[in-house]
Structure formats: structure tokens, C-alpha cells
């Protein structure tokens, strides 16, 4: 009875704004025979469900066996997951190419790039562009076929990337980098939406980790490829001139652009837009794929804008906590990433050694993200896991700030310390997966994702700008990073306390039994009595 009472309360005791919104009935109604449990309030409210979802969602929860769940997940893993992973890999590779080319002669060929502050703008302008287009991108993603829109943007950014090879002035590079940011802005929001569309709540942390750890994979593969391209020596290459007809940095931009363009075509013709539109599977399988994510309690898709959800997103403290997690992790990440090769070269390594050492950073990032996902799976503790992975970041930063590079031993120690700083990447990945699992209501989720990536962009844009000329040991930059780590720990502590209180309040008011009948009703996490937060 607790379940029935919770479900009924969730529908009948919704905020006044919800009732007023629902009084305006849709012109087209979905006609269905309601289940036996309807009088108990354990059936879906079809006035609130997206009509495309309603064609496949049962009036009440449909049981999907464990065997069926595994079979369906394997089907999704074979079709959707590889595309997400490879797309994110290519996006990370394309975006990170400027760091690889920073020691391949581009700073000598383009006037003004020898200044660290000027060079930093080539990363900053990408994220300023993403910042401007983030909300329009999220708005579009809620209303168009996700796969087709993603594929179009891949084609666009790959073309822009290849055009980098034609740029021999700072304004030209800023222009193409800005366009690159505009078209790549679709990637993470699209993948967060797709993760929620295709995967159950308990699967999402691992899925986000799979595609997000491609940041590390691109360091490994990118390091190898950059090493290979560094052997191309044009007569203009001051460090070691040769007789190649093309500069190494031009070759890498053209090659990566062509590969990404071909991949964009594959995505357009292969990736399903949603479980409801997947032509590659039977109608019965599509119904089961929809039903298996009902328990997420976050909805599937809904094109209707609900003003009260917009307001709730702006007033919800967890929105700003997720923003804090992003800005306090991306600010250090973007700066360290943009100047990675330059920092390692300053330790006394040559160009080819630096390109190979970039691979180790990739291993650290992958190990961090996989390790944090494994720890969450075993302990069910997302925020405590974030805090644990902050310890090496503090340690590595303090060592670099206090130890001078005087011999081979300190050189090796500083290199290792630099690598372990990147363990704070765990907070980025877990923060994004928590957002997809803890925010209900499509309008609210869209606003939260947009604001989350505003913070992500702001951190990435500011990060390279805290590296100053005349600061050879980067003491000012690293001091700012320590401040970010400290602020992040405060955010983690507050968010954990806040979410624990919310769950206890719902347990007291509605009981601990949970019904999934209203999982597609486009209710927010606050108004849905069956919703419980993960922390």
C-alpha cells in the first residue's frame, strides 16, 4: 500500500503549477485500456508522456526479466556504445591536436604563438564558443533526431579541423578554433541524453566512464600518431629541418579531419535516434528497451516545455553543485592539458620523447576513470569516491610547487607528480553521471545540462589563461589549482549532505517502497515521490 500511496500522492499532490499545466490537455490523446491497478494510481498519466514514448510504454510497469535485460543491453552495447565511444575519442583527438602541434613548429610558423598567453587563447576560444551555443544546442537536441544532428556536426567539425592546415596567422587560427568549438559543442550533451535514453540508472556511471575515458585513449593514440607525424620535417622546422613538402602540423590536421569526416557519414547512417525510432530492431524489442529504463524515474524524452521545471532547475542547489564540480575540475584540466607538452619539454625532454610521454598521461586518465567507476560500483558511494581521488592531485601539485628540477631523480619525480595530478578527472566523469541519474523532468534536465556545460566551458576557457609568461615553474597557476581542489571538496561535502536529507525526507513522507509506474510522466526529481537520489 505504501507503493500505491506514493504513486497516487505523486500524481494528485503535485505542485499547483503542475496541475495548471496539465489542465491544458493535448489535442491528440493516446487511447489505451488501463490496467487493473489504475484505481490505485499505479498507471501512467498519458497527458504528460511524450506521444512517441506512449506508443511503446505500457499503462503500468511491464516486468522485464534479468535474461531479457542482459540480451537487450548487449544489443544496445553492440550498436550504440561503440559509436558513442569512437565519436568521443575522435572529438577529444581533434580538440587536443593543438597541444600536440605546439612543439611541431606551428608556434614558429604562426606569428605571436611563442607567447604562452597568446597560445592559450587557441584553447580558450573553443570553450567561449561552446559557452555561447550550449543552450541552443541543448534546445535543438530535445527537438530533432539526436543521431542525425550529431552526425551533421561531426561532418562540420572535421571539415573545420582540416582547414587548420591553411592557417598561418593568429586571427585565422582563432576563427577556425571558434568554429571547431561551435560544432563540437553537441558531443557531451548528446551523449548524456543518449546515456539516459538507452541505459538503466545503475548502468549509466559505467557507460559515461566508457566514453569519457576516451580523453585518456586519445592521449595514448594521439601520442603515438604525433610521434609519427613529428618525423615529417619541413625545411621551416627550426629544431630539425628536413625536405618534406608539407609541415608536420599541417599533415596531422588534414589526416584527422579526413578520418572524422568519414566517421560522421557512418554515424548518420548507422546510429538510431532513440529506442522508439530504431529500425534495426523489432517492435517487441523496442517496447522492451523502453520499459527497461522506466525505473530510471527521469523520463525518456518530452518536447513540451514546462515553465515550472525551468524555475525548479534554477532554484535547485544540486544544479549549482554540479556546476561547481565541473568548473573546479575543468579549470585545472584545461590548463594542464593545453600546456602539457610544453610543461614536459620544460623538464628537459626532447620533442619525440614528449610525444611518447603523452601516452603515459592517457594511461593515468583511463586508470583513474575506470578505477573510480569500479569503486562506485562496489561501494555505491559517488561523492566519497570523488574525494578519495582528490588526494593524489593535492600531493602531486604540492610536490611540483616545492621541489626544484636539479637532477635526473628530481626530473623523474616531478614527471610522476605531474601525472598523478590528473586523478581528479574522476570527479568530472562521476559528476556528469550523477547529473543524468539525479535530475528528473525533461525541461529541468535540459536546463541543468546546459548550466552544467556553461560551467564546464567557463572552466576550460579560464584554465589556459592562468598560465602566465614569466612564471617558469607555474607557481601562480598551481596555487590557483590548489584553491580549486579545496573548493571542490567543499562542494562534494555539501552535495552529499543535501541529497542524504532529501532521501530521508521522502522515506518519511512516502515510505521506502518505490513504484515505477510514473517513470515516463515527465515529473521532476523533487515532485516524484518515488525518486531517490544517488550520492
Question: Predicted regions span which residues?
Answer:
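Intracellular terminal tails of multi-pass secondary transporters
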Residues: 1-90, 268-299, 303, 445, ...
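Extracellular/periplasmic helix-loop-helix junction of adjacent transmembrane segments
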Residues: 99-132
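Conserved MFS/SLC helix-loop-helix module at the cytosolic interface between two early adjacent transmembrane helices
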Residues: 131-171
Amino acid at each position: 500500500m505504501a507503493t500505491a500511496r506514493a504513486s497516487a500522492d505523486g500524481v494528485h499532490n503535485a505542485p499547483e503549477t503542475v496541475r495548471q499545466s496539465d489542465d491544458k490537455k493535448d489535442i491528440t490523446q493516446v487511447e489505451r485500456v488501463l490496467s487493473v491497478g489504475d484505481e490505485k494510481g499505479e498507471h501512467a498519466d498519458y497527458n504528460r508522456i511524450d506521444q512517441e514514448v506512449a506508443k511503446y510504454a505500457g499503462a503500468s510497469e511491464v516486468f522485464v526479466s534479468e535474461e531479457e535485460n542482459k540480451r537487450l543491453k548487449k544489443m544496445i552495447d553492440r550498436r550504440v556504445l561503440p559509436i558513442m565511444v569512437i565519436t568521443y575519442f575522435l572529438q577529444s583527438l581533434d580538440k587536443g591536436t593543438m597541444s600536440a602541434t605546439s612543439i611541431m613548429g606551428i608556434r614558429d610558423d604562426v606569428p605571436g604563438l611563442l607567447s604562452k598567453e597568446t597560445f592559450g587563447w587557441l584553447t580558450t576560444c573553443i570553450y567561449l564558443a561552446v559557452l555561447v551555443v550550449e543552450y541552443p544546442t541543448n534546445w535543438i537536441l530535445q527537438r530533432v533526431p539526436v543521431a542525425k544532428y550529431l552526425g551533421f556536426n561531426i561532418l562540420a567539425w572535421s571539415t573545420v579541423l582540416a582547414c587548420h592546415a591553411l592557417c598561418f596567422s593568429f586571427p585565422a587560427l582563432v576563427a577556425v578554433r571558434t568554429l571547431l568549438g561551435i560544432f563540437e559543442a553537441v558531443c557531451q550533451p548528446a551523449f548524456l541524453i543518449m546515456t539516459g535514453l538507452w541505459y538503466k540508472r545503475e548502468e549509466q556511471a559505467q557507460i559515461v566512464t566508457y566514453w569519457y575515458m576516451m580523453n585518456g585513449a586519445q592521449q595514448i593514440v594521439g601520442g603515438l600518431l604525433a610521434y609519427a607525424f613529428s618525423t615529417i620535417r619541413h625545411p621551416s622546422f627550426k629544431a630539425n629541418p628536413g625536405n618534406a613538402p608539407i609541415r608536420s602540423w599541417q599533415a596531422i590536421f588534414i589526416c584527422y579531419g579526413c578520418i572524422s569526416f568519414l566517421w560522421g557519414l557512418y554515424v548518420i547512417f548507422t546510429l538510431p535516434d532513440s529506442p522508439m525510432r530504431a529500425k534495426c530492431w523489432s517492435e517487441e524489442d523496442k517496447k522492451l528497451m523502453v520499459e527497461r529504463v522506466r525505473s530510471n524515474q527521469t523520463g525518456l524524452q518530452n518536447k513540451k516545455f514546462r515553465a515550472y521545471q525551468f524555475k525548479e532547475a534554477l532554484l535547485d542547489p544540486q544544479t549549482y553543485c554540479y556546476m561547481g564540480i565541473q568548473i573546479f575540475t575543468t579549470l585545472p584540466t584545461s590548463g594542464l592539458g593545453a600546456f602539457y607538452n610544453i610543461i614536459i619539454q620544460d623538464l628537459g625532454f626532447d620533442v619525440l620523447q614528449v610525444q611518447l610521454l603523452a601516452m603515459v598521461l592517457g594511461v593515468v586518465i583511463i586508470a583513474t576513470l575506470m578505477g573510480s567507476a569500479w569503486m562506485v560500483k562496489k561501494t555505491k558511494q559517488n561523492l566519497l569516491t570523488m574525494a578519495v581521488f582528490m588526494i593524489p592531485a593535492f600531493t602531486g601539485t604540492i610536490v611540483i610547487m616545492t621541489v626544484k628540477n636539479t637532477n635526473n631523480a628530481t626530473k623523474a619525480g616531478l614527471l610522476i607528480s605531474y601525472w598523478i595530478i590528473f586523478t581528479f578527472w574522476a570527479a568530472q566523469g562521476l559528476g556528469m553521471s550523477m547529473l543524468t541519474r539525479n535530475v528528473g523532468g525533461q525541461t529541468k534536465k535540459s536546463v541543468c545540462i546546459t548550466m552544467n556545460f556553461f560551467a564546464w566551458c567557463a572552466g576550460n576557457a579560464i584554465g589556459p589563461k592562468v598560465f602566465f609568461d614569466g612564471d617558469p615553474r607555474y607557481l601562480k597557476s598551481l596555487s590557483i589549482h590548489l584553491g580549486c581542489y579545496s573548493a571542490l571538496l567543499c562542494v562534494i561535502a555539501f552535495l552529499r549532505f543535501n541529497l542524504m536529507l532529501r532521501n530521508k525526507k521522502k522515506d518519511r513522507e512516502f515510505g521506502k517502497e518505490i513504484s515505477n509506474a510514473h517513470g515516463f510522466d515527465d515529473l521532476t526529481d523533487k515532485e516524484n515521490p518515488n525518486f531517490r537520489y544517488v550520492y
